[in-house]
Amino acid sequence: MQPDHRKKSSVEVDFFTEYGEGSRYRIEEVIGKGSYGVVCSAYDTHTGEKVAIKKINDIFEHVSDATRILREIKLLRLLRHPDIVEIKHILLPPSRREFRDIYVVFELMESDLHQVIKANDDLTPEHYQFFLYQLLRGLKYIHTANVFHRDLKPKNILANADCKLKICDFGLARVAFNDTPTAIFWTDYVATRWYRAPELCGSFFSKYTPAIDIWSIGCIFAELLTGKPLFPGKNVVHQLDLMTDMLGTPSAEAIGRVRNEKARRYLSSMRKKKPIPFSHKFPHTDPLALRLLEKMLSFEPKDRPTAEEALADVYFKGLAKVEREPSAQPVTKLEFEFERRRITKEDVRELIYRESLEYHPKMLKEYLDGSEPTNFMYPSAVEHFKKQFAYLEEHYKNGTSHNPPERQQHASLPRACVLYSDNNHPVAQQSSAEVTDGLSKCSIRDERPRGADRNAQMPMSRIPINVPQTIQGAAVARPGKVVGSVLRYNNCGAATGVEALEQQQRRMVRNPAAASQYPKRTQPCKSNRGDEDCATAAEGPSRLKPNTQYIPQKVSAAQDTAMSRWY
């Protein structure tokens, strides 16, 4: 039976939203599970969109974890931008003072940049340019709000098949104010070492600075170019060795700014190293791209460009118009007053409840007027979802992916945890032994054919969603991989792309589907991929027919490894 897409009256929609939101979302299946709780895909009957509902269990067991959740949902409410993942809704808890779980509705993204890099060995210079452009544009917006992400890495960059990227995971982000101390102790700073700026190596003390995020973006861009991490250090010493092997020994002044004493002594005693020319490290790469990358990877933080300066670089000539790109209003101190004092479990519970009210205007008005009851007089959607989540989670643990009885008749729902570009491929089932727990995000082990090597230490992730297949005469890709240019190739070339991109920049869109347009330049496969990519690379590059139109679909992962991701 087809869903009813008839437009409801405004009165009906308001009532449906406030008092019937349990019927708004049709739960479909479990798409991720971790120590935090469970994530289910769902269908939003209001908008007709696929969404992901994340249930976070026992969030107040540890105040630090609850504070991180509060920080993220608050920042994602304040930072509304096409290059930042969007929270669409937060379900109102059944009780203001006693709730333990929360349900957050995110937009559903198909993959992340980590999977894109693994699955595509024939990304073009246009992909590199457009990916970096989006990252810097989103980062400019974040930094103009005086927010610093602090944990940028490929797995925290979500991706869709139209080459749209979105920054996510703001749990470690911080807001800087004018009276912020010169040195901050990052008690929860556990960001991945590989993307950590050198001034942070071995030290949890650092001043809030945009240069930390710029370094991370540089590492991500370098990984796009080579297909493997640039500085995969095993420990702090190894990390410094890898950095200096490529960038050369830093100056005495730069070493003096490293806060960790042991790291300073190690760098001072290190033999003098000459920097490796970036053209040798990244052969066949646009010199303009390398010049910008070299700036972003400067050892000295003061030598790195800001996101706005990077967008103005000649590398983006004809693509970016910095003056048209949106900036954010600085976040006010009042929003993050809780960061400046010690808060209790009851404090953070009230603050999270207050955040959820932002998505319920009528209840928010009652709350602000002081007329809102502690216990609600209508059934909460949370109670409605608890049963469905429990049913799905039970079958998920048992190695099946059945839908609830009332949903099993719908044959068009997303299937198990592997995404195939070949619709005739049998659907793989997932056993409980394959579930990776204890991750901070939705995590499902991705599977490879037997004999294919994998990095056992790499957390496996991402969930299923239907990726649009190539159309209009697109070249046939190898099984499991959908390929295409950054945007439809046409005779208009780059001019069309700039015009389309300007239109996207001038408006805030919830699900942008347009990227830049320009002719595709053929790029040979990367030959220096890591072992984990050998099985994919062995199949050979996909061949694209010349002068053919194709839509942008570089995101889909290789056969048996593709996962989509919630958010």
Curated annotation (Swiss-Prot):
Regulation: Activated by threonine and tyrosine phosphorylation.
Compositionally biased residues, Polar residues: 545-567
GO MF, one example: ATP binding
The UniProt record lists the keyword Chloroplast: no
Cellular component GO terms, alphabetical: plant-type vacuole
Binding site for ATP: 31-39, 54
Residue interval(s) of motif TXY: 187-189
Keyword Electron transport listed: no
SMART domains linked to this entry: S_TKc (SM00220)
Region of interest: Disordered: 428-455, 512-567
Catalysed transformations (reactions): L-seryl-[protein] + ATP = O-phospho-L-seryl-[protein] + ADP + H(+); L-threonyl-[protein] + ATP = O-phospho-L-threonyl-[protein] + ADP + H(+)
Sites of Phosphotyrosine modification: 189
Key words, A-Z: ATP-binding, Kinase, Nucleotide-binding, Phosphoprotein, Serine/threonine-protein kinase, Transferase
Enzyme superclass (EC): transferase
Phosphothreonine: residues bearing it: 187, 192
Xref: InterPro entries: Kinase-like_dom_sf (IPR011009), MAP_kinase (IPR050117), MAP_kinase_CS (IPR003527), Prot_kinase_dom (IPR000719), Protein_kinase_ATP_BS (IPR017441)
PANTHER family assigned: MITOGEN-ACTIVATED PROTEIN KINASE
Domain text: The TXY motif contains the threonine and tyrosine residues whose phosphorylation activates the MAP kinases.
Protein name (record): Mitogen-activated protein kinase 16
Gene that produces this protein: MPK16
